[in-house]
Amino acid sequence: MAELKTVGRFAPTPSGRMHLGNVFAALIAWLSVRSKGGEMVLRMEDLDTQRTSEEYAQILREDLRWLGLDYDRETPPQSARSAVYDRYFDKLAEMGLLYPCYCTRSQLHSVNAPHLSDGTYVYPGTCRNLTEAQRATFHRAPAWRVRVPDRVWTVEDWVQGHYECNLATDCGDMVVRRADGVYVYQLAVTVDDGEAGVTEVVRGMDLLSSAPRQMYLQELLDFPHPAYAHVPMLLAPDGRRLSKRDKDLDLGQLRARVTPESLIGTLAFSAGLIERNEPVPARELAGEFRWDKLRRESIFLNSEQLI
């Protein structure tokens, strides 16, 4: 049997300039794929069309080229794939797994709603078994949820190790389409990765809890499970997660004062991939990349380290 080709992906949201956390995840994803002679796919995750734009998408492409992180093909953006998601939504509906949910945001986040220790809410199934007569009393468009089983899902993550989640108790039935008709991240990403033939998903540790949710949808929609690697978060010195609000650490600012080689070198050194903080092009790291070198804990960075 022929060995399965490695396919990875960049999946940025074109809502602003890339920040260092985006660059770090993209770098590790790229190194993993290129170290195996695999294929990189670019996909713009622009479900929220109010916050995203083609202008930022083009800037993201230019930033990736500047960094030396090439890709082999670009798939259509999520905003152009509603008809595709419709087909998979219909498949879930035909399986009898979808139901309309009329809960408001305030109801879901009320102090009386079930919450996990990190503050996220667990959907209690309020609308799961409503009768048609009860549904008729609501005079607003519903969101749509997929029923989840009382079952433990396990992820053997390349970075975080063993992780498990019972969707029924740790998540509850998941929204797959919002009341305004927009498909949500979990369904769109599952379909996009599945149709693109993605074999490994590399992204930030903050998305680890998404893996079991997507594995469940993959099983329902007949997609194979990819391998998962959730890389450490990049944090500011005060412990905040770097975001697009940290303007001094986004590529719009950094490109004016550092070279791509120095930026790649600092990230690789901070992650434990090289022994000295020195400029290095991404292509020189690919041949030596190994997952067991990568740090597991969060990485603290400030702008002075990049001068």
Task: Give the residues covered by each predicted segment.
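A general structural signal for well-ordered secondary-structure junctions
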Residues: 70, 98-99, 117, 260, ...
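Short, mixed-charge aromatic SLiMs
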Residues: 48-58, 236-238, 286-296
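Non-catalytic terminal extensions that flank enzyme cores
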Residues: 1-15, 35, 40, 135-137, ...
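Active-site cores that bind ATP or allylic diphosphates and position pyrophosphate for catalysis
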Residues: 106-243, 250-254, 303-307
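Short, surface-exposed acidic
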Residues: 72-74, 225-228, 274-280
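A short, terminal or domain-edge coil/loop segment
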Residues: 93-105, 151-155, 159-164, 278-297
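Alpha-helix initiation and N-capping motif
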Residues: 57, 82, 105-108, 120, ...
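N-terminal Rossmann-like or analogous alpha/beta NTP/dinucleotide-binding catalytic cores
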Residues: 2-116, 205-206, 210-223
